[in-house]
């Protein structure tokens, strides 16, 4: 009998009823919510006279709509209504939350792990497509729609069809100047944004083993850009050490770890598809187009037009085949988002700007992903490094990742961004987004254009 993957083991643990190949009813261990996808779900509960079945397994935070300057000055009517409504709903339904402006508030996919609520073995959902981030801990985690949010509120369960399994093995040692963001951007560039459709993606290999938990979260975060709702990794000592001592960690921690150690893929586990990437051959990545697969290694020319999507992307981005990343005239730099706004990301970026100043006519902002990260960074003096270099140092939130709050890239301006999506108008109407690592974004801020971080003294 073939061995089981970590996903198989967790699926079996949470299966309540249902036949294979059909929707199956799954138990949910942790439900994260934010202000955008929860209001209608709460209203549905009220209309039906229902309560939240397990408020103790539900946690809310404010992230998408919150301003990162003057955080209480919310001028957009819809944004203010959503924030006010979540404040009302968590109070009415008795749900623990990181209140707007509180010392815990931040992006949901950062606050969850920081509180210790994200743990190996859990089945986690949230009304947000980047919920796969939590899979880095050895959890099943994926985004759901608002009607499903209401279903989880009412029943603590969700109907799901078990996906196929894909194994992506990252092997080898990356060159200096190549980071986990480059791993996932390279994967998407090689195989496309639909390669993971219908699959859960398990990321493994010695290159994954050597990453920190924060670096692992970056990879799982962008599973959805690879086409998969779910990304997962096997937990190890780094995982246990990250969770230990946090408020939400299990009280009997040693017993929990003993259980978690059984939740790893068997050596003979079977997968429907296997991809292997040698990271020693990778280079810093930069996207040129309007989906994350439209990316190249630094120094490579942008590809020839292959179809209408390429033609439209080039027209929107005001670029052309044969150009290179270093040819792009940047106007904005954004270091933040649930992909790359953790403390280690800010530390990395700060190395490239310390003692320097951003290029003229450039706007650069740093948005820590949570209040704890901001406080920790300030204790280390990172805020001063960034501000002395001409960056704006902001309060936590989703910020410029998406145009749902005051932080937007102006029409027609090119932005080097550490976020996860480069769709048309994603960062504001007419914004031209180039996805990259925090190192590439920080170095670009100083030079005014993309440069090869592998050649800079900061990586030597």
From Swiss-Prot:
Cofactor note: Binds 1 [4Fe-4S] cluster per subunit.
Residues holding [4Fe-4S] cluster: 338, 398, 401
Reaction(s) the record says it catalyses: (2R,3S)-3-isopropylmalate = (2S)-2-isopropylmalate
Short name of one Pfam family: Aconitase
Keywords of this entry: 4Fe-4S, Amino-acid biosynthesis, Branched-chain amino acid biosynthesis, Iron, Iron-sulfur, Leucine biosynthesis, Lyase, Metal-binding
Claim: Ion transport is one of the keywords in the record: no
Listed EC numbers: 4.2.1.33
Keyword tRNA processing annotated: no
Pathway(s) it belongs to: Amino-acid biosynthesis; L-leucine biosynthesis; L-leucine from 3-methyl-2-oxobutanoate: step 2/4
GO molecular function: 3-isopropylmalate dehydratase activity; 4 iron, 4 sulfur cluster binding; metal ion binding
Swiss-Prot/TrEMBL cofactor(s): [4Fe-4S] cluster
GO BP, one annotated term: L-leucine biosynthetic process
InterPro entries linked to this entry: 3-IsopropMal_deHydase_lsu, Acnase/IPM_dHydase_lsu_aba_1/3, Acoase/IPM_deHydtase_lsu_aba, Aconitase_4Fe-4S_BS, Aconitase_4Fe-4S_dom, IPM_dehydratase_rel_enz, IPMI_cat
Domain of life: Bacteria
Biological function: Catalyzes the isomerization between 2-isopropylmalate and 3-isopropylmalate, via the formation of 2-isopropylmaleate.
Stated family: Belongs to the aconitase/IPM isomerase family. LeuC type 1 subfamily.
Subunit structure: Heterodimer of LeuC and LeuD.
Name used for this protein in its record: 3-isopropylmalate dehydratase large subunit
Species of the source: Streptococcus sanguinis (strain SK36)
Gene name per UniProt: leuC
């Amino acid at each position: 009998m073939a061995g089981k993957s970590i996903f198989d083991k967790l699926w079996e643990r949470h299966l309540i009823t249902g036949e294979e190949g059909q929707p199956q009813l799954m138990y949910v261990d942790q439900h994260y919510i934010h202000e955008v996808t929860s209001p209608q779900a709460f209203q549905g509960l009220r209309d039906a006279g229902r309560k939240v079945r397990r408020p103790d397994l539900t946690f809310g935070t404010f992230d998408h709509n919150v301003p990162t300057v003057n955080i209480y000055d919310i001028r957009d009517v819809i944004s203010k209504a959503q924030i006010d409504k979540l404040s009302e709903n968590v109070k009415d339904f008795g749900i623990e939350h990181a209140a707007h402006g509180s010392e815990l508030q931040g992006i949901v996919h950062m606050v969850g792990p920081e509180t210790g609520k994200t743990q190996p073995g859990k089945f986690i959902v949230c009304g947000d497509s980047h919920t796969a981030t939590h899979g880095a801990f050895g959890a099943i985690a994926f985004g759901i729609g608002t009607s499903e949010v209401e279903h989880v509120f009412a029943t603590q369960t969700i109907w799901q069809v078990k996906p196929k399994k894909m194994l992506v093995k990252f092997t080898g040692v990356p060159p200096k100047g190549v980071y986990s963001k480059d791993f996932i951007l390279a994967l998407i560039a090689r195989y496309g944004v639909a390669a993971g459709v219908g699959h859960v993606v398990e990321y493994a290999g010695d290159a994954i083993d050597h990453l920190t938990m924060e670096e692992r979260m970056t990879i799982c975060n962008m599973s959805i850009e690879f086409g998969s709702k779910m990304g997962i990794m096997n937990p190890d000592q780094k995982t246990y050490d990250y969770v230990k001592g946090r408020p939400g960690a299990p009280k009997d921690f040693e017993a929990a770890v003993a259980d978690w150690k059984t939740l790893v893929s068997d050596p003979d586990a079977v997968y429907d598809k296997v991809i292997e990437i040698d990271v020693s051959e990778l280079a810093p990545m930069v996207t040129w187009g309007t989906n994350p697969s439209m990316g190249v290694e630094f120094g490579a020319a942008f590809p020839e037009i292959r179809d209408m999507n390429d033609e439209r992307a080039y027209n929107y981005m005001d670029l052309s085949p044969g150009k290179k990343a270093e040819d792009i005239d940047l106007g904005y730099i954004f270091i933040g988002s649930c992909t790359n706004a953790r403390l280690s990301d800010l530390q990395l970026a700060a190395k490239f700007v310390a003692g320097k100043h951003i290029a003229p006519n450039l706007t650069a902002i740093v948005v820590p992903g949570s209040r704890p990260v901001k406080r920790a960074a300030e204790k280390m003096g990172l805020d001063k490094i960034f501000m002395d270099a001409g960056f704006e140092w902001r309060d936590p939130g989703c910020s410029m990742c998406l145009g749902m709050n005051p932080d937007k890239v102006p029409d027609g301006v090119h932005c080097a961004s550490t976020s996860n999506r480069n769709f048309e108008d994603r960062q504001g109407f007419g914004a031209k987004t180039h996805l990259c690592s925090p190192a590439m974004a920080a170095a670009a801020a100083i030079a005014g254009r993309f440069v090869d971080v592998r050649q800079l003294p900061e990586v030597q």
